[in-house]
C-alpha cells in the first residue's frame, strides 16, 4: 500500500540530544537508545470513518519522535499499518450498504490527505492487513507450533498461560484487564475458553464475512496478531518504540508484546511502549463509536493545517484534554505572530532558541515548553529587538524541523 508524500525537513546546525520518552512498561521517562537506524512502529487506523483530532494527536506525537531522532543523527525506519479488515469496518459497510473494500480504500485515501496536510512524515512501509494475510497466518502457525494456541469451534486462540510476563506492558491488575478486554474487542465471557483473557488469533469463516485460506481453514486474523506480524516482518524483534494512543495499552499492545515474545523468544518485543493521551469533546473521549468527532478533513477547510498542528502541540502528548474551538483560534493568532516574526529582516539571535527547543523536545516531547520558547523569541523580534539578519530564517527552519510547523 502506498504511503503519502514526505514534506522537506530542513537540516539544522549541530546534532540534537538523545531523546527521552515515557515508557509505559517501565512507568518512567528514560532514554531511547537506538542504533544508527531507529525503529518505530505506530498502530494505524481502522478505516471506517474519517481521521479525527484524536488520531491526529497520536500521529503528531510520533511524528515528533521521528523528527527528533532524525535531528539526533539517526536514520528512522518507521512502519505503520492500516487495519483494512475488522469488525467495525464490516459493520459500517453493512449499515451503509457499501462494499467494505471501497469504504476502506476511500477512508485510507482521506487519511493520507490529512497526514500530508498536517505534515506528518510518512512511514517507510504503510501496510494494509489484507496485503499480508499470509504473513499473519505464518506467525500464527509458529505460535501454534510452540504450543501457545488452542482451537475453539474452529477459532484459534492465544493461551495466556503461554505468556509468563503477561501484564508487564500495562501493569494492570487482572480485574482491570478483564474490564478493558470486554470493552475493547475481547470476549472474556465466551464459553469454552481456557482463560477469560485468552485472545483471538484467527476467526473462522462466518457467513457474509470476508475470509482467506490458511493452515487453520478459511477465516481472517484477529486484531492484535496483525500488528505483531507487520512489525516483525519489517522491523524485527526488539525495535525501539511501539506507539499508539493510550487506549491501546491494553489489550492491544499487551497482547502483541507476548505474541512477539513467544514467537521470537526475546523480551522485550519493543524496547519502549509509548502512548499519547486521549482527546475529548463534550466531556467524552473522541471516538468513532461515540460519534463525538471533530474531523481533520473538515477542520482544515476552515483553518490553516499549521494552526491545527499548533493547537495540538499546545498540549503535552501524554495528557488527556478536551478540544474547544477557542484553542484553534489561539493557535491561529500564534501562527500569525510567528510568521510575522520570521518575516522580519533581522531578529534576536536564534542559537539559543535551537538549544532550548532541543532541550525541551528531547525531554519527553515537551511541546508546550517549546512553543513558549518560540513565543518569547517572536515577542522580542516583533518589539524590534535583535539585529541578527540570519535569525528569522534559522527560527523558521527550527520550527519546521523540530515541530513540523511550516511558517
From Swiss-Prot:
A motif ('ERGGDP' region) lies at residues 183-188. Monomer. A motif ('KMSKS' region) lies at residues 285-289. One of its GO terms (molecular function) is zinc ion binding. L-cysteinyl-5'-AMP binds at residues 43-46, 58, 81-83, 223, 245-247, 279. This is L-cysteine:1D-myo-inositol 2-amino-2-deoxy-alpha-D-glucopyranoside ligase. The gene is mshC. The lineage of its organism: Bacteria, Bacillati, Actinomycetota, Actinomycetes, Streptosporangiales. The keyword Nucleotide-binding applies.
Amino acid at each position: 500500500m502506498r504511503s503519502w508524500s514526505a514534506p522537506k525537513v530542513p537540516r539544522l546546525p549541530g546534532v540534537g540530544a538523545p531523546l527521552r520518552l515515557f515508557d509505559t512498561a517501565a512507568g518512567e521517562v528514560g532514554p531511547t537508545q537506538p542504533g544508527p537506524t531507529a525503529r518505530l512502529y505506530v498502530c494505524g487506523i481502522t478505516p471506517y470513518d474519517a481521521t479525527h483530532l484524536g488520531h491526529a494527536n497520536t500521529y503528531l506525537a510520533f511524528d515528533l519522535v521521528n523528527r527528533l531522532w532524525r535531528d539526533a543523527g539517526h536514520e528512522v525506519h518507521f512502519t505503520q499499518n492500516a487495519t483494512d479488515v475488522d469488525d467495525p469496518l464490516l459493520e459500517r459497510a453493512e449499515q451503509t450498504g457499501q462494499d467494505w473494500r471501497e469504504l476502506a480504500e476511500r477512508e485510507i485515501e482521506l487519511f493520507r490527505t490529512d497526514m500530508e496536510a498536517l505534515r506528518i512524515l510518512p512511514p517507510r512501509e504503510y501496510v494494509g492487513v489484507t496485503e499480508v494475510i499470509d504473513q499473519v497466518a505464518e506467525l500464527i502457525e509458529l505460535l501454534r507450533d510452540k504450543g501457545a494456541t488452542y482451537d475453539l469451534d474452529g477459532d484459534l486462540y492465544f493461551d495466556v498461560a503461554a505468556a509468563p510476563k503477561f501484564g508487564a506492558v500495562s501493569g494492570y491488575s487482572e480485574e482491570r484487564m478483564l474490564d478493558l478486554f470486554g470493552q475493547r474487542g475481547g470476549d472474556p465471557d465466551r464459553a469454552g475458553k481456557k482463560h477469560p483473557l485468552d485472545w483471538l488469533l484467527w476467526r473462522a469463516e462466518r457467513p457474509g464475512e470476508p475470509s482467506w485460506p490458511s493452515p487453520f481453514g478459511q477465516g481472517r486474523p484477529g486484531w492484535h496478531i496483525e500488528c505483531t506480524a507487520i512489525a516483525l516482518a519489517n522491523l524485527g524483534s526488539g525495535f525501539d518504540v511501539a506507539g499508539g494512543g493510550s487506549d491501546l495499552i491494553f489489550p492491544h499492545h499487551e497482547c502483541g508484546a507476548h505474541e512477539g515474545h513467544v514467537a521470537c523468544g526475546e523480551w522485550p518485543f519493543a524496547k519502549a511502549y509509548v502512548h499519547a493521551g486521549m482527546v475529548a469533546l463534550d466531556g467524552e473521549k473522541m471516538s468513532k463509536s461515540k460519534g463525538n468527532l471533530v474531523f481533520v478533513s473538515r477542520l482544515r477547510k476552515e483553518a490553516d493545517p499549521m494552526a491545527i498542528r499548533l493547537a495540538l502541540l499546545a498540549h503535552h502528548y501524554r495528557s488527556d484534554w478536551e478540544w474547544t474551538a477557542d484553542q484553534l483560534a489561539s493557535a491561529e493568532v500564534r501562527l500569525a505572530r510567528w510568521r510575522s516574526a520570521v518575516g522580519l529582516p533581522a531578529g534576536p539571535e536564534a542559537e539559543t532558541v535551537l538549544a532550548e527547543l532541543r532541550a525541551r523536545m528531547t525531554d519527553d516531547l515537551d511541546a508546550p515548553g517549546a512553543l513558549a520558547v518560540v513565543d518569547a523569541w517572536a515577542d522580542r523580534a516583533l518589539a524590534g529587538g535583535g539585529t541578527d539578519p540570519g535569525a528569522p530564517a534559522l527560527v523558521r527552519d527550527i520550527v519546521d524541523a523540530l515541530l513540523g510547523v511550516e511558517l
